[in-house]
Amino acid sequence: MKSCKQLIVCSLAAILLLIPSVSFAADSNISVKLLNYIGNKSSISLSPTGFYKVTGDNVAVTDRFAGASRYETATLASNSQWKNPNTVILVNRDIFIDALPVIPLAKKLNAPVLFTQPDTLTKTTERQIAKFNPDNILIIGGARSISKDVENKLKSYGAVKRISGKNRYVLSENIAKQMGSYDKAIVVTGRVFQDALAIAPYAAAHGYPILLTEKDKLPDYDLPKQVIIIGSSFSVSDSVENQIKKTSTVQRIPGSTRYELTANIIKQLKLKADKVVMTNGTKYADVLIGASLASKKNSQILFVKQDSVPAAAKSITKDKATYAYDFIGSTSSISAEVENSLADEFYLADGGTYNLKINSGKLNLENIKTYGNSLRIKPENYSTSNRISLDGKQYLGTVNFSIESTKYIRPVNENIPFEDYLKGVIPNEMPASWSLEALKAQTVAARTYSITKTGTTVPDTTAFQVYGGYSWNSNTNKAVEQTKGKVLKYNGSLITAAYSSSNGGYTEASNEVWSSSVPYLIAKKDTKDPQIGWTLTLSKQQLDTKSLDLTKPSSWWSSATETDSARLSGVKNWILKNKETSADSVKIASIDDLSFSGTTQGQRAKTASMKVKYFVKSSTGSYNLSKITTISVPTSELRTMIGATVFKSTYVTVKKDTSKYTISGKGYGHGIGMSQYGAKARAEAGDSYSSILKFYYPGTTLTSY
């Protein structure tokens, strides 16, 4: 049906036949193609409220770095981010204690981290160093970690420097000395690798050193004024924390598991995590490679299990709207099932703004990924707490976007609960401020009209019913809820519940507009309709021919326009279709006569006659300036030609004077069935919604579907 905000115009496109009696479930769904408010656009702005996610095959951005060995995996990861680094850092493949503090320094030096065997320079690593051709090679750890023989071999590829220490704690302090000045430091246990590498990307991003400590004894460090302790008191004891507090302010980030720890770091430090590196939290080499990659890409690291994503990590990917994943290691580290589960959906940021556009014939979620011809975005669960805004208009439930006519994005609001669909329709078909009984009558008419379309997709336009998504109003919600399931039937079958804005004081019979005569859609006087009046003027002379050089029409054809050009485009289209089928274009020079004849059962003008003089430009570029025709059509057809928003009904008369025609009319719309303004007046007079429906649809029964 049709809605024009203050004044409502309704039309019916369906064939008026009795609808067979069918049983409809109260929880039936309906889908809506969004055209009315969205229009035809090549880009749409999306903004979710609550939890919405993109779903489908491989919708997230994913990459996996998996070699046959840790050396190859490190090589693959380094190749993805570095081309010709000035420095390469080398660590022992197994002795994790050397590598724990190195990531912040690697970030400072913009250096990849590679593995080697202790006594032999691993061939894969050697080839990678040769490829990078660095000026400097930095060895981490003493000769027991990486031998002098390896060091000597490395000298053929660049200047070699070694950072070592008599123990892991001194080594971390010596690495910290290479960081320059800093106002904050990270203190972690030196007994396990997960705590230090979990915080490493954050520390690297801010230039904070990572200092190792024993659980119950803090080495003699010169600490800055701010310290972050990573891990619970089982990793770094309360006594160590209290010792640090004597000189520094302390923030502790605990975690009951390694998986929870990486999540807590992101949450407590309020880090952006739309892109993350995922590693198996039990595998040192994968975690070190992941920490190096994350620090280079300014992303975060999350630990997962081989066959599952722990709840803490899932919570981060949801709350932080993670859409890009780098997986470290083969499927023996992180299974294909885990990768696929993350690849096949990702959450959008609550309150975030995204731009969906067409790029080279495909849908592109800007700054995220390019897809195919469709993309589905759905809420975590259907709820008014989860909403999605499309170009500023909110909708509930799932929206599927597809490319239409190769150039437009067409959203479909999928599987809306039918009664919620009505809540989005009623305030767009009748002002929500009107009397509740009028709104209830409107609701029953709208429900009856659309209930047979459950399980299908309908438009949100006046071609069916205007659906405004989550444009709910408490008053219209009440009307829907208080009439839940109520419909109109005639002899046991659903009726075609036509309605219009105003009938002008007389309802129209269905057979006067459509081919079918329906016993409950009859012509009769309506004393409650306010008989809304309107006028429309059309000038007799449409082109100022005195100012035109009629001998040279090509000089003015493209610039000359009719006085009422906006209202005559349909008339010109009729001429091109019915009279001048091979012409390029026509112009209306004058309207020489306009009249209406015949009267319908509903007191409306049956036939319209318009005599026009027009000019023709042929497809070959020749002109004819002496054409005349009389257009004789049903008045409803002329109304469509001129425009139903200005030629508001066929309940009309015409007055002629020397310069113009004045069409005077009553009502707005076809006049069949219920008058919305009439329903308003009847409700204000005290009529119940059932009485209103009984008047406009005589012989019908108000019942449940």
Swiss-Prot record:
UniProt name for this protein: Amidase enhancer
Topology class, membrane: Peripheral membrane protein
Function in brief: Possibly involved in cell wall metabolism during spore formation. Enhances the amidase activity approximately threefold.
Main location as per UniProt: membrane
Keywords tagged on the record: Cell membrane, Cell wall, Cell wall biogenesis/degradation, Membrane, Repeat, Secreted, Signal
Region (3 X tandem repeats): 64-349
Organism: Bacillus subtilis (strain 168)
Signal peptide location: 1-25
BP terms from Gene Ontology: cell wall organization; sporulation resulting in formation of a cellular spore
Entries under Pfam families matching the protein: CW_binding_2 (PF04122), SpoIID (PF08486)
PANTHER family: AMIDASE ENHANCER, N-ACETYLMURAMOYL-L-ALANINE AMIDASE-RELATED
Location of this chain's protein in the cell: Cell membrane; Secreted, Cell wall
GO CC annotations on file: extracellular region; plasma membrane
Induction, per UniProt: In stationary phase; under control of SigD. Repressed by LytR.
Matches recorded under InterPro entries: Bact_Sporulation_Assoc, Cell_wall-bd_2, SpoIID/LytB, SpoIID/LytB_N
Keyword Iron: no
Recorded name of the encoding gene: lytB
Membrane-crossing segments per the record: none
Residue spans of the Sequence repeats: 64-161, 162-251, 252-349
